[in-house]
Amino acid sequence: MHNDKDFDQWNEEKKVLHADAERLFFHEREIWYCHLGNNIGFEQDGRGELFLRPVVIIRKFNNEIFWCVPLTRTLKDLPFYFAFAMHVDTETSNEQSAAVLSQIRLIDAKRLRRLVGYISEKDFALLKKKLKALLP
């Protein structure tokens, strides 16, 4: 079996993240670049040297942990994908994105890198409704 993922590089980055005492302040509905890392099988990976991927924060439990859903630019018409216009806090007003609902994860705030934007209240309500529909 061919394995082209660099788990060793991700492990080194994870050690740095773990040792970092800083946790950034975040809110539900925000979209952040997050160090998701190199993962197993079909789990969503981060990209680049820092293993980053945008995520939308679904549920904040406290200042340390939250549920998030990874985002992709690949739009698929499947029940576990939710397409929406991401509102970016920079010069770009809207960017099409899709939340991969089946990949919901509990994340420590140490993994957060940079605030990118947010999802509208209307789209956030629809996203949560679609997430709940996936439960048995």
Q: Residue locations for each model-derived region?
A:
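Short, charge-rich amphipathic segments
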Residues: D20-F25, V55-P70, E121-A125, A133-L135
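C-terminal terminal-subdomain/extension
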Residues: M1-N11, V16, L24, A85-P136
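Compact nucleic-acid interaction/catalytic patches
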Residues: Q44-T90
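Short, charged beta-turn/beta-strand-edge "cap" motif at the junction between a beta-strand
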Residues: G37-F42
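Pocket-edge structural micro-motifs
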Residues: H35-L36, P70, S102-Q103
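Loop/turn positions that initiate beta-strands
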Residues: E28-R29
